[in-house]
Curated annotation (Swiss-Prot):
Subunit structure: Interacts with PALS1 and NHERF2. Found in a complex with EZR, PODXL and NHERF2. Interacts with MCC, PLEKHG6, PODXL, SCYL3/PACE1, NHERF1 and TMEM8B. Interacts (when phosphorylated) with FES/FPS. Interacts with dimeric S100P, the interaction may be activating through unmasking of F-actin binding sites. Identified in complexes that contain VIM, EZR, AHNAK, BFSP1, BFSP2, ANK2, PLEC, PRX and spectrin. Detected in a complex composed of at least EZR, AHNAK, PPL and PRX. Interacts with PDPN (via cytoplasmic domain); activates RHOA and promotes epithelial-mesenchymal transition.
Taxonomic lineage from the root: Eukaryota, Metazoa, Chordata, Craniata, Vertebrata
Activity regulation summary: A head-to-tail association, of the N-terminal and C-terminal halves results in a closed conformation (inactive form) which is incapable of actin or membrane-binding.
Protein's name according to its UniProt entry: Ezrin
Residue segments, region Interaction with SCYL3: 42-92
Species the sequence originates in: Mesocricetus auratus (Golden hamster)
Topology in the lipid bilayer: Peripheral membrane protein
Amino acid sequence: QLFDQVVKGFPTWLKLDKKENPVQFKIQVWHAEHRIGFPWSEIRNISFNDKKFVIKPIDKKAPDFVFYAPRRKPDTIEVQQMKLQDFEQKTK
């Protein structure tokens, strides 16, 4: 699976890779040129709550990796009206 988001204008991906062995997985997170990998055997827990994806490693001294997936808020009425006016002007 691939979770996609844009952070400060650059795409960021969270990907779950399946290796040759059906029980081996690897999680990769990368942003532009930076890539972070998590072997499945080193992950204690994975949780997802609304906008936050958390990977907890087996080593309790290691920090948790938190991946935020912002949700797009619906346009306000004013913005919707401006878009409608712009669309009407373009179609004339």
